[in-house]
Amino acid sequence: MTNQIEKELIEKVAKLSNLKLKEEEIELFSNQFKDILSFIDKLNEVDVKDTLPFYELQIEEKSEREDIPTGSITNEEAIKNAPQAKGGFFVVPRVVGEE
């Protein structure tokens, strides 16, 4: 990727994320992006033909827990300290959309 494409990509992602980045932040993220892509290239060079895929590994330890309901707070307790609540829901300022 060229620097221009990387810069354009970072600016596009920032815009989609509603972020305003300074020029030096764009440069920093561009360098980090290059480092990540370079690392991925190195990973792609690794010979894994004799390595079992992860899904074939046998893991003896039980990694799932039983789904047992536990006590929780009521809706009223959850919103009692909220600055604003309406109809049992938190009221928060709009963060996306119109500027």
From Swiss-Prot:
<protein>
    <recommendedName>
        <fullName>Aspartyl/glutamyl-tRNA(Asn/Gln) amidotransferase subunit C</fullName>
        <ecNumber>6.3.5.-</ecNumber>
    </recommendedName>
</protein>
<keyword id="KW-0067">ATP-binding</keyword>
<dbReference type="GO" id="GO:0050566">
    <property type="term" value="F:asparaginyl-tRNA synthase (glutamine-hydrolyzing) activity"/>
</dbReference>
<dbReference type="InterPro" id="IPR003837">
    <property type="entry name" value="GatC"/>
</dbReference>
<comment type="function">
    <text>Allows the formation of correctly charged Asn-tRNA(Asn) or Gln-tRNA(Gln) through the transamidation of misacylated Asp-tRNA(Asn) or Glu-tRNA(Gln) in organisms which lack either or both of asparaginyl-tRNA or glutaminyl-tRNA synthetases. The reaction takes place in the presence of glutamine and ATP through an activated phospho-Asp-tRNA(Asn) or phospho-Glu-tRNA(Gln).</text>
</comment>
<dbReference type="InterPro" id="IPR036113">
    <property type="entry name" value="Asp/Glu-ADT_sf_sub_c"/>
</dbReference>
<dbReference type="GO" id="GO:0050567">
    <property type="term" value="F:glutaminyl-tRNA synthase (glutamine-hydrolyzing) activity"/>
</dbReference>
<keyword id="KW-0436">Ligase</keyword>
<keyword id="KW-0547">Nucleotide-binding</keyword>
<dbReference type="GO" id="GO:0070681">
    <property type="term" value="P:glutaminyl-tRNAGln biosynthesis via transamidation"/>
</dbReference>
<keyword id="KW-0648">Protein biosynthesis</keyword>
<dbReference type="GO" id="GO:0006412">
    <property type="term" value="P:translation"/>
</dbReference>
<dbReference type="GO" id="GO:0006450">
    <property type="term" value="P:regulation of translational fidelity"/>
</dbReference>
<comment type="subunit">
    <text>Heterotrimer of A, B and C subunits.</text>
</comment>
<dbReference type="GO" id="GO:0005524">
    <property type="term" value="F:ATP binding"/>
</dbReference>
<comment type="similarity">
    <text>Belongs to the GatC family.</text>
</comment>
<dbReference type="Pfam" id="PF02686">
    <property type="entry name" value="GatC"/>
</dbReference>
